[in-house]
Every structure is written in structure tokens, then in C-alpha cells.
């Protein structure tokens, strides 16, 4: 599944909204925001996909 801005993903009952996807130096970074706390985070796409599951019926 292609990660896109605006998608909602979850982990351990917490929801995260993808706020940006950026390619830098042969790596894809995913920037995302915790929907409950508002804290923003980023990690490599591979790590993001290993940690989170997409919520397919919501944007």
C-alpha cells in the first residue's frame, strides 16, 4: 500500500495521521501526527510500515 498524506494509521489503539511523505537521499521519510496528543514524529517508510496498520475506511 502506498503511504499518502492524510491517511490514518494505528498502533496499540492510537491513531496517527500522515502529514507528509518525503524522499531524501534515497530514503522515504514519513511524517505523522498523533491524533490524540498532537505530537509529530517521523521515521523511514520501512519502519513506519512495520509499526503501524492502515485504517482503510478513513482519511
Language-model features: locations:
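Intrinsically disordered, low-complexity, charged/polar segments
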Residues: 37-59
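Basic/aromatic-rich interaction segments and small domains that mediate binding to polyanionic partners
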Residues: 12-45
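Short coil-to-beta transition motif at edge beta-strands of beta-rich domains
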Residues: 1-12
Amino acid at each position: 500500500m502506498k503511504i499518502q498524506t492524510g491517511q490514518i494509521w494505528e498502533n496499540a489503539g492510537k491513531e496517527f495521521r500522515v502529514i507528509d511523505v518525503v524522499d531524501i537521499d534515497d530514503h522515504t521519510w514519513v511524517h505523522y501526527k498523533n491524533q490524540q496528543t498532537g505530537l509529530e514524529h517521523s521515521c523511514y517508510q520501512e519502519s513506519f510500515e512495520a509499526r503501524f496498520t492502515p485504517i482503510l475506511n478513513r482519511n
